[in-house]
Regions:
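C-terminal structural segments of small proteins and small subunits
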Residues: 114-130, 135-136
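A glycine-rich helix N-cap at a beta->alpha junction
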Residues: 83-109
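General beta-strand structural signal in soluble alpha/beta enzymes
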Residues: 69, 99-100, 135-137
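Conserved mixed alpha/beta catalytic, RNA-binding, or beta-rich assembly cores of soluble enzyme
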Residues: 17-80
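Glycine-rich, charge-decorated loop segments at or immediately adjacent to ligand/cofactor-binding or catalytic sites
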Residues: 75-80, 106-113
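Short amphipathic alpha-helical segments and helix-helix/interface helices
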Residues: 54, 84-88, 125
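Short, well-ordered alpha-helix to beta-strand connector turns
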Residues: 28, 64, 94, 131-132
């Protein structure tokens, strides 16, 4: 029997849905560190790469224990960032989002922080020392 169009669409929509729910996300003993708002070159592809990495991570079954945003990457955690909902989702999964206060101060963005914990250098070093793997973007 050939499935009708409704059944086919249901399968396709279900198959491509996001695979992670808060209850099933597991924390790996790792830390991801973002220092820029792009990966590689500062062009459309580089900016899309950061977006793609964070969105894919938010749909993964295993997420890092920490994600650190420092230098210009703190801009991803402030008001009007296109990635706020994605980073919020990761935080709800239990990922500890650390945002460098020094960078926010230098960029005059401290009052615009909307996701994550304001962190000092001691917090950042402590997080790095708690994990087995640090991934730097």
């Amino acid at each position: 029997m050939i499935p009708d169009k409704l059944e086919q669409n249901f399968f396709e929509d279900t198959y491509y849905e996001k695979r992670v729910w808060i209850a099933s996300a597991r924390l790996s003993n790792s830390l991801m560190m973002f220092s820029k708002t792009f990966v590689g070159e500062d062009d459309e592809m580089g900016r899309n790469a950061v977006n793609d990495i964070l969105v894919t991570l938010s749909e993964s079954e295993i997420v890092p224990k920490y994600i650190v945003f420092w230098n210009n990457a703190v801009k991803l955690c402030v008001e009007d960032s296109e990635l706020l909902s994605v980073i919020n989702r990761l935080e709800k999964y239990g990922v500890r989002i650390l945002v460098a206060g020094h960078a926010l101060d230098k960029l005059n963005l401290k009052s615009s922080l909307r996701v994550g914990k304001l962190a000092n250098h001691f917090d950042l070093i402590d997080a790095i020392n708690q994990v087995q793997k640090v991934i730097n973007f």
